[in-house]
Amino acid sequence: MQHPREENSIVVELEPSLATFIKQGFNNLVKWPLLNIGIVLSNTSTAVNEEWLTAVEHIPTMKIFYKHIHKILTREMGFLVYLKRSQSERDNYITLYDFDYYIIDKDTNSVTMVDKPTELKETLLHVFQEYRLKSSQTIELIAFSSGTVINEDIVSKLTFLDVEVFNREYNNVKTIIDPDFVFRSPFIVISPMGKLTFFVEVYSWFDFKSCFKDIIDFLEGALIANIHNHMIKVGDCDETVSSYNPESGMLFVNDLMTMNIVNFFGCNSRLESYHRFDMTKVDVELFIKALSDACKKILSASNRL
């Protein structure tokens, strides 16, 4: 019998500055939203609202919304979870399977329920106190992925709950919800001495290799776009930005992208420091080709899992 969850690592050997570039890009660009926009609609349990919202915020949703990874990373889509559960003598606990899961199309604000794997029944979230017939405990809550704009249009699509209650409770808490995009990285990534390593979790109910490819494809596209948009000031060196003086041959390095790219072409630079370097050695298209080849190598390694 296949275990529902396995920890694995994907390892590739790369030129050290390129490995560092990919690792830093992953950590800065691959942002999976947390469920930080949480609203408790009803709660007679012994856990206070803040405890529920903290637990729900960190639900590992990527293993549920795996069919929509690319559009969630590009923020074309968001998602929400909804829980309405009452304690009974027979069922005295809550698992992740008790939630309903919905994908949100940000263009239309359409809300569509997604299938949930039965394996979620094995992930316990809360245990009620001892059951008493006259004081059964209940909880109802909803939580949206970070970055979701709560407006009348999207609220009108929440046909599974009492909109009046939602509006009242949302108005009570909206001022304390973090307006910034709150996220986590899908995996831990390290790159000691060019040994780029992804520490991943593989689940039995979906094709991890396909999902991992979606993530790497997104990362490659985002990195290439950033490379094309990146500028180094030419002229007198300015310590507020990366800059290069062609007359003196001095380069001031003030950002990670500049550092990694020039190091790939033989410089031994560090952040916030001056280096004598011939910038004509830098071939951006050659670096992009090396990046694309590295991404192919990463995907090839993932296929061996």
Swiss-Prot record:
Keywords, sorted A to Z: DNA-directed RNA polymerase, Nucleotidyltransferase, Phosphoprotein, Transcription, Transferase, Virion
Signal peptide start-end: none
A Gene Ontology BP annotation from the UniProt entry: viral transcription
Gene Ontology molecular function: any one: DNA binding
Catalyzed reaction equations: RNA(n) + a ribonucleoside 5'-triphosphate = RNA(n+1) + diphosphate
Gene Ontology CC entries for this record: DNA-directed RNA polymerase complex; virion component
Keyword Transit peptide part of the UniProt annotation: no
Main localization of the protein described in the UniProt heading: virion
Family: Belongs to the poxviridae DNA-directed RNA polymerase 35 kDa subunit family.
Protein name (record): DNA-directed RNA polymerase 35 kDa subunit
Protein source organism: Vaccinia virus (strain Copenhagen) (VACV)
